[in-house]
Amino acid sequence: RWRTLIEQMLSRGGPRLYQKPAVTREGRVHHRELMCRIFDGNEEVSSAEYMPMVLQFGLSEEYDRLLISRLIPLLRYWPEENLAIQVTAESLIRPRFQRWLRDTLMQCEKSQRRRIIIELAEADVGQHISRLQPVIRLVNALGVRVAVNQAGLTLVSTSWIKELNVELLKLHPG
């Protein structure tokens, strides 16, 4: 069931995208977080529910390419907004994906690249830090910002905070 649903979603251009403002303590919108949902025929399913299956089926690279390809045109629609998208570490550590990401980002104006925030889960950062460092340096050099979310959810070393150029930490509410 899951595999069919995910493959259909990918063949139709990806998940449904929604945006949620991330607001500072001062009440200012820092960025808009793009959230993904898929429709299973009855209801919408959040990415928290289906992403483990995307990873299990080895479809994260295709999924992340679709999301980034869909994010870029949104930068033109919202010229004043910073847009954040969750990207899997599994995609980012693959050289083929890194080349695609570099080439795709190079086609954007620098002013647009500065408004992209790639979000990574802290557990993935802790697990893949040495393999993530080069691609984080690459995207930072291109002007793209990096955020780490779910910080504090799992027990991982915090040494990555000094090792990676992360602009934003999003704490897990727990």
Q: Predicted regions: what is each one?
A:
Residues 22-25, 38, 90-92, 97, ...:
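Hydrophobic pocket-lining residues within nucleotide cofactor-binding pockets
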Residues 40-44, 68-72, 150:
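Short acidic-capped amphipathic helix/loop micro-motif used as an active-site/signal-coupling element
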Residues 29-33, 59-131:
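Catalytic core of bacterial c-di-GMP phosphodiesterases, primarily the EAL and HD-GYP domains
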Residues 2-53, 86:
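Active-site core of bacterial EAL-family cyclic-dinucleotide phosphodiesterase domains
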Residues 1, 5, 49, 53, ...:
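Cyclic nucleotide signaling catalytic output domains
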